């Protein structure tokens, strides 16, 4: 059975592999691997370390000592098109808060592989999990929000053609050893429009299962407007970002693993109060919503928490046209969150 690999994450920053070729116009230094290289990296796919959905994840080694994880999908034409789309997007992207493409394999038929940098702290969802031994400090949470907003601003407003990510969520935000964030997984991304894209005209003739496969986004993060209309837009990304900010402030999951309740539903009254009062909210309610694991940190500025909640609330507004752009969010956080000063020169893109 043929297969393709969609993700390789490297553990160190050094790599002795020299680029063998790159696509015309692509980011320099991206290595093109052969399928023999891919098999060698995984020792012929001998070390399975995880599975999920349509994929299996194998342990791999690069240059004999650098650990990597390879995410392998059962091959199909549809999955190959997803791979090709993500490859073409990543070859064009170069930003400090977007995961870096280091290499790829593509046989131009049904097999392909993306080699991406490894970030040792895992993803944001794992770090916010209340079972995590390490509590993510407040200033790191504000920095993550700011950096992700910068990444979204880059793909929305500084790329040509512009890009809609399509699946902004905490598990698609990776963290390096200093807890700087990088946006990953562009498999759902849409390219070539400034604000929105209509679904294919052939959608109405497809089976319910086919329609389901075409849907993008994840439970708890997906814009209700997209679910109603099938129109993916930049404002859809801002909705997902708003949910991530709620997670950062509260430490709660986008969808409760215990009750199955969505965070946007359990916080609806708070969001409405913020919007109805033009952003004004009492300190007691702010304290009640703040992650209780942060309550021992007396240095937290509640005005910063209020700013984060305002940003989240405005990103969740309906209709989507009322939501801020990524640039507006970057400007607001830059101006209203003093704790971002610890980022120094990294505060600016």
From Swiss-Prot:
InterPro entries: Kinase-like_dom_sf (IPR011009), Prot_kinase_dom (IPR000719), Protein_kinase_ATP_BS (IPR017441), Ser/Thr_kinase_AS (IPR008271). The keyword Ribosomal protein does not apply. It comes from the Eukaryota. The modification Phosphothreonine is found at residue 34. Pfam families: Pkinase (PF00069). SMART domains: S_TKc (SM00220). The active site is at residue 167. It catalyses: L-seryl-[protein] + ATP = O-phospho-L-seryl-[protein] + ADP + H(+); L-threonyl-[protein] + ATP = O-phospho-L-threonyl-[protein] + ADP + H(+). The keyword Isomerase does not apply. Its EC number is 2.7.11.1. Keywords: ATP-binding, Kinase, Nucleotide-binding, Phosphoprotein, Serine/threonine-protein kinase, Transferase. GO terms for molecular function: ATP binding; protein serine kinase activity; protein serine/threonine kinase activity. The modification Phosphoserine is found at residues 171, 210. Residues 43-343 form the Protein kinase domain. It is an enzyme of class 2 (transferase). This is Probable receptor-like protein kinase At1g33260.
